[in-house]
């Protein structure tokens, strides 16, 4: 286990925190014949987005997972996933980091990318959404202009940290700046109550939003479903959808039409693919979110984005573009407003241990 902290290139303002540094827990798993796999859990400034932090991930893995994992068959990922779930309640980020390393091992042992083990990729690249979360209005507009010049055609505006009128004006000015040909989304990160969410979305309807993400607290599934039926903009569940069971509950209630996939909140790649399968069966679309991972964690999320058919809303795998540092020898690649497929063995990236040690905690 290695804990590390990597600053972002500019503060990232969200409804629940303003992020200046991302905290990481990196997991290294080695087999008896010397094969090594890596996993990552990225935490947004401690236990802010979820109950977990890099420190809690380390404790759970070192004390409750690693002791029984040693000596087990690393290729039996499903069996190990189920045993982790039995031995460790909750703590999906910790479990995901370990499972991620096991997938990396499995792909490397067979000489194939993880997406081949998930059924093969159904796309060669995934459209990339850039999140606008800049406190200073003019700086935010300039960032949007620069990203458009670089080929970005999808933006997500982080709301809920400001008064509603301020956020509505932000969206209006961003739409005016990027033009009608660029896709625009909004993410409240649970920042609104029911009346505020209804007022906000109706006020934002003139700006042609693709969707509004997680407008209400994660526990308010009834409110999410009711809200979705009262507005014309599609509603996406993120924090509300952390497991296959959550996905099933959301699908049964109806209304919400998009599910956000995240490997760490679903306790691993297998759990994430299960959420995607439920979405597909229920006729829902999917979007691959992020926790601002390095290229290592981004590569794991990308395997899902490439292999899961219902990922029709793109992704926000921009972590390596926002972080000031990375931990791999060759970062993930972007072109024409998309993140490109990785076809190397395992997760498709190789750890640069020198770079990792430079950002590791002392």
Question: Predicted segment positions?
Answer:
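Conserved phosphate-coordination/catalytic loops
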Residues: 134, 138, 165, 218, ...
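N-terminal capping/lid subdomain adjacent to the active-site entrance of alpha/beta enzymes
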Residues: 1-185, 189-198, 202-206, 230, ...
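Shared catalytic-loop signature of beta/alpha-barrel
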Residues: 202, 208, 219-236, 241-338
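Flexible, glycine/charged-enriched surface loops at secondary-structure junctions
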Residues: 75-77, 113-117, 211-218, 290-291, ...
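A cross-family glycoside hydrolase active-site/sugar-binding cleft signature
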Residues: 129-131, 156-158, 185-189, 213-215, ...
